[in-house]
Each structure stands twice: as C-alpha cells, then as structure tokens.
Amino acid sequence: MKKILLTGFVPFLDNPINPTEEIVQGLHKKSVNGWEVVGEVLPVDFHVTGDHLVELIHKVQPSAIISLGLAAGRNRITPERIAINCNDGPVDNQGYKPDGEKIISDGPDGYFSSLPIKKMVKELENNGIPAKISNTAGAYLCNHVMYRALHEIEQQKLDIFSGFIHIPASHKLALTNNIPSFAQKDLQRAIEICIGCLD
C-alpha cells in the first residue's frame, strides 16, 4: 500500500489547541482510499522543523505528503498553491522571530504545490464542505514546511506529490475567539476527501 506522510503542528501563539494535531493523530496508521497514513506532529520551531521534516521524508519514503496548518479566521478548507522562500512572522514556540530571511539561501523564490488542488476543492465542495485555493501560505512555519518538502523533492528528484492545506479553527478552538469554525470530525473528513483525490 502506498504511504502518505501527513503532518500537523503542536499548538502555537495563543492557541491552546491545534486541530491539525488531532487530525494527524486521528488518521495515523489508518487506511484512506488505498493510502496508508503516517502521521507526524511537528514542532513550531524555525530551527528544527524543516530538518525534521526532511528526515521524515527519507525515513517514511512516502508517495505523497500533505502538511496541515491552522489558519484561524479562514472560513473554508484552503489548499495552498505556492510556497515562497521566506521566513517571517511572529515568534515561534522557542521565542525566535524571523525577519524575512530566506529558507534556503540559494533556493528558488518559490515552488508550486504538486497536489491536485483544483480536484480537491471540487470534491470538497461536492461533499458540502466550503473550500477554495489559497494563493498565499504566509511566511510562517506553514509556508516553511511546504517549501522545505518541495525543495527536498526537487533537489533529490523524488517522485512524491507534496503540498499544504490550511484548515479553519475547530469549534473547541473558537470557544474563546469570535472566528469561523468547523466541527473537528468535519475537518478530519475534509482531509480524508483530499487524500482520496490522490492517484
């Protein structure tokens, strides 16, 4: 059975939970549409997260990678189109604040997702789940891991589909914030649908 590496993140900033962590834990070792899910929760740390992801790619040897991130405030599932070679944003969980430096000093300006993002959006909408392609993954850890995975695949000429999907807040996370939210089970179902779009 083909393997898919599914990653999420631990809680960060002022978020007490991270629904991507729950999705990854919920799908770990499960079979989804012929794919064996290998789930991994990543730290929110600019200095170690990218290297850890690269190590996982070579250890797991997946045929596909979907990385997940929380975009609290968005009101739909948003597969990302592009990752840019830039670290920026608020502090990570170790207190480090990037200031626009490159992720890879001699790397290209950006990489496009190799996931079937249009198909994913269509299938999500066909299942009654709001979805839209996003043209910016930001410059925080979400963009960082998307870029690092795609860069490693390009440099090593690996035959791996890879990309990133941002999800809205879960209801539990929205209890203390006035933001759009989904039921956790619907967020997980959305990712299962996205996995089902892979050939």
UniProtKB/Swiss-Prot annotation:
It holds the Pfam family Peptidase_C15. InterPro entries: Peptidase_C15, Peptidase_C15-like, Peptidase_C15-like_sf, PGP-I_bact-type, PGPEP1_Cys_AS, PGPEP1_Glu_AS. SUPFAM superfamilies: Pyrrolidone carboxyl peptidase (pyroglutamate aminopeptidase). The active site is at 80, 142, 166. It is found in: Cytoplasm. It comes from the Bacteria. It catalyses: Release of an N-terminal pyroglutamyl group from a polypeptide, the second amino acid generally not being Pro. One of its GO terms (cellular component) is cytosol. Its EC number is 3.4.19.3. It is an enzyme of class 3 (hydrolase). The keyword Chaperone does not apply. Keywords: Cytoplasm, Hydrolase, Protease, Thiol protease. GO terms for molecular function: pyroglutamyl-peptidase activity. GO terms for biological process: proteolysis. NCBIfam families: PRK13197.1. Removes 5-oxoproline from various penultimate amino acid residues except L-proline. Belongs to the peptidase C15 family. PANTHER family: PROTEASE FAMILY C15 PYROGLUTAMYL-PEPTIDASE I-RELATED, PYROGLUTAMYL-PEPTIDASE I. Homotetramer. This is Pyrrolidone-carboxylate peptidase. It comes from Oceanobacillus iheyensis (strain DSM 14371 / CIP 107618 / JCM 11309 / KCTC 3954 / HTE831). The lineage of its organism: Bacteria, Bacillati, Bacillota, Bacilli, Bacillales.
